[in-house]
Amino acid sequence: MEYVPKILVDADACPVKAEIKQVAEQFQLEVIFVASFNHYSVNTNGENWIFVDTGKESADMRMMNIANKGDIIVTQDIGLASILLAKGTYVFSNRGELYREEEMSLMLDIRYRHAKERQQGKYSKGPKAMSDQDRSLFKDRITTFLQNK
């Protein structure tokens, strides 16, 4: 029997949960949202949520433990993305960018340099706010990926 991938979502700060649910319904894929207890809600609307303790890497560790080759991951955490790519998963950013292993070294280096600059008091602007166009682009990209898979 062929493995049916699931969608794992690093849900603490994910702005495209609704779009992920729509795509999952369209392709009949299971979605698992992983978040810290800080984001706990009794109203999960029948969705599959896993809540973990509030430790720094708790959600990341849980995602690493339940991800399988072929699964689709949505995260904006580049460190987590690099680890999950090595497991043979497909990792998307919240903006629909499909991460690639060959880009990870450079992306991790840039993240490190930005962290050093912030420590030195050189603050850069964060990412721009998500627009409806960004949400639509995310949905289009992940839909196209699944159609071609």
Swiss-Prot record:
CDD domains in the record: PIN_YqxD-like (cd18720)
Pfam family, one: DUF188
InterPro entries: UPF0178
Family to which the UniProt record says this protein belongs: Belongs to the UPF0178 family.
NCBIfam families: PRK00124.1
Protein name: UPF0178 protein lwe1471
